[in-house]
Amino acid sequence: MKRYYITITGTEFRHGSEFMKEGMKVKLVKEPDNEYDKEAIKVTLTPIDTVGYVANSVKTVIGECASAGRLYDKFGAETEATIMYVLPDGVIAYVDGEEVLVRDILK
């Protein structure tokens, strides 16, 4: 089964990424009413709320990570991801929601 890796970007506009650690779970929540990006997926962490967004631009996606656009139709309203690396240019995480993997199998 394919594992999806994502870049979490925009942390510098919120709470930074210094508190993020390897293994930390975050929630990915679709934001269809986002005025800037109809495929926006915000990244939340309880109790902080929004800590960033899944990168959706060639300028912000690191390496072979999936963009928000590639990931958007792979899950329902929300799913979870696990942080792998905290880098100067972004945070790398993998999506661990089972529904993402099931939707790929059914295609």
Task: List where the protein language model places each region.
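Conserved active-site motif detector
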Residues: 1-107
